[in-house]
């Protein structure tokens, strides 16, 4: 079982996404935040659950929402959540 660790870059991405959405729709922002934070939970026991990234070597991708992708890396001791990106605007990073 691996710990899931959010890097500062991923936390900053998440914070910015939620802030932007909350300006227009606070309820949608809360729901998306919950979704993005919970979609990574199975990684602790199943680190290879999601596909390898064709765009960024060494990373894996979770399409957590039609517009948002969570990028993560499996290391020898943990799962690192690296970035959360908008599928159209910020990808590839």
Give the predicted meaning of each segment.
Residues 48-77:
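Basic/aromatic recognition patch in beta-strand/loop cores that engages polyanionic ligands
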Residues 3-59:
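Basic, Lys/Arg-enriched alpha-helical interface segments
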Residues 30, 68-69, 73-93:
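Enriched for short, Lys/Arg-rich terminal
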Residues 43, 62, 91:
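Short clusters of hydrophobic/aromatic residues that line enzyme substrate/ligand-binding pockets
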């Amino acid at each position: 079982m691996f710990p899931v660790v959010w890097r500062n870059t991923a936390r900053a991405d998440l914070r910015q996404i939620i802030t932007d959405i909350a300006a227009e729709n606070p309820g949608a922002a809360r729901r998306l935040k919950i979704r993005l934070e919970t979609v990574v939970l199975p990684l602790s026991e199943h680190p290879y659950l999601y596909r390898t990234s064709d765009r960024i070597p060494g990373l894996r991708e979770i399409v957590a929402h039609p517009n948002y992708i969570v990028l993560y890396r499996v290391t020898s001791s943990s799962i690192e959540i690296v970035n959360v990106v908008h599928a159209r605007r910020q990808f590839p990073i």
